[in-house]
């Protein structure tokens, strides 16, 4: 959720007039606390369910005994820095650090920072510019298509709701019953993420329909919009049909439901934290 390339950050940035970096820095404390709540609860449940111990280690080693294990020796620091270059540029350019003499050039957008990172990658890896250009635009195209597909679907859904008058009725209700906003903005996307296994569509639909009216409802665009986005991501984490849950369950060779038994309690507490303290 704190990635400069997040579609949610870009959407809220456009609504609020802030840069993407400023949007991410605004919600970062709540994001990290929600993550910490989930991690602590997951650790406690691991102890309760006894998901640790020598028997688990021996079982894993027995399964991997016949597998070929490649040991990676040494780390190329220049390679490791490549993904961080755009992020560091955006963080410096989006904060007061850009006013330091010599750092004024860091004030730029996400595409420019990504291009600088790509050029750095070409230099340190000494790979063919043709190959890295193909991979760069291939990755950019796939990401753009996936994000744009969700945004179009959410926009069509919201347009349908607006045509029926449902959005206007909901906004009017929320203006008169302001206390329901915090729960609708968090529990709604959370439940949709839980049910569908994808929190992005629900959060984008909410942010398209409701977040533009955030000031009328007594909230900032950043807090209301990013609370919905984070809640949707939390709901996805607690969903047994989410892609990441299915993959992790396959790696652990357990049922996705067993995974959710351990992730859902922490996610529920995290979304309650967002509702009570972020909004």
Swiss-Prot record:
<feature type="transmembrane region" description="Helical">
    <location>
        <begin position="186"/>
        <end position="206"/>
    </location>
</feature>
<dbReference type="GO" id="GO:0015556">
    <property type="term" value="F:C4-dicarboxylate transmembrane transporter activity"/>
</dbReference>
<feature type="transmembrane region" description="Helical">
    <location>
        <begin position="240"/>
        <end position="260"/>
    </location>
</feature>
<dbReference type="Pfam" id="PF03606">
    <property type="entry name" value="DcuC"/>
</dbReference>
<feature type="transmembrane region" description="Helical">
    <location>
        <begin position="77"/>
        <end position="97"/>
    </location>
</feature>
<feature type="transmembrane region" description="Helical">
    <location>
        <begin position="105"/>
        <end position="125"/>
    </location>
</feature>
<dbReference type="InterPro" id="IPR004669">
    <property type="entry name" value="C4_dicarb_anaerob_car"/>
</dbReference>
<keyword id="KW-0812">Transmembrane</keyword>
<feature type="transmembrane region" description="Helical">
    <location>
        <begin position="29"/>
        <end position="49"/>
    </location>
</feature>
<protein>
    <recommendedName>
        <fullName>Putative uncharacterized transporter HI_0585</fullName>
    </recommendedName>
</protein>
<keyword id="KW-1003">Cell membrane</keyword>
<dbReference type="InterPro" id="IPR018385">
    <property type="entry name" value="C4_dicarb_anaerob_car-like"/>
</dbReference>
<dbReference type="GO" id="GO:0005886">
    <property type="term" value="C:plasma membrane"/>
</dbReference>
<feature type="transmembrane region" description="Helical">
    <location>
        <begin position="147"/>
        <end position="167"/>
    </location>
</feature>
<dbReference type="GO" id="GO:0015740">
    <property type="term" value="P:C4-dicarboxylate transport"/>
</dbReference>
<keyword id="KW-0813">Transport</keyword>
<keyword id="KW-0472">Membrane</keyword>
<comment type="similarity">
    <text>Belongs to the DcuC/DcuD transporter (TC 2.A.61) family.</text>
</comment>
<keyword id="KW-1133">Transmembrane helix</keyword>
């Amino acid at each position: 959720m704190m990635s400069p390339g997040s579609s949610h950050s870009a959407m809220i940035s456009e609504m609020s007039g802030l840069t993407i970096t400023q949007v991410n820095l605004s919600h970062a404390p709540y994001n990290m606390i929600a993550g910490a709540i989930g991690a602590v609860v997951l650790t406690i449940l691991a102890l309760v369910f006894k998901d640790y111990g020598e028997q688990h280690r021996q079982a894993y080693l027995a399964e991997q005994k016949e597998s070929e294990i490649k040991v990676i020796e040494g780390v190329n620091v220049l390679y490791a820095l490549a993904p961080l270059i755009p992020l560091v540029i955006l963080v410096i350019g989006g904060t007061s650090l850009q006013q330091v003499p010599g750092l004024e050039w860091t004030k730029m957008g996400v595409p420019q920072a990504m291009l600088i990172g790509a050029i750095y990658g070409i230099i340190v890896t000494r790979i063919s510019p043709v190959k890295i250009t193909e991979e760069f635009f291939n990755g950019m195209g796939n990401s753009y298509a996936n994000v744009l597909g969700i945004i179009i679907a959410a926009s069509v859904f919201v347009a349908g709701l607006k045509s029926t008058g449902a959005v206007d009725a909901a906004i009017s209700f929320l203006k008169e019953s302001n206390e329901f906003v915090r729960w609708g903005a968090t529990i709604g996307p959370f439940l949709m993420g839980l049910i569908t296994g994808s929190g992005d569509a629900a959060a984008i639909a909410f942010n398209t329909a409701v977040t533009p009216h955030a000031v009328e409802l007594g909230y900032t665009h950043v807090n209301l919009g990013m609370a919905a986005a984070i809640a949707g991501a939390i709901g996805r984490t607690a969903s047994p049909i989410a892609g990441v849950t299915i993959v992790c369950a396959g790696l652990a060779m357990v049922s996705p439901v067993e995974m959710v038994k351990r992730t859902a309690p922490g996610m529920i507490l995290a979304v309650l934290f967002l509702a009570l303290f972020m909004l």
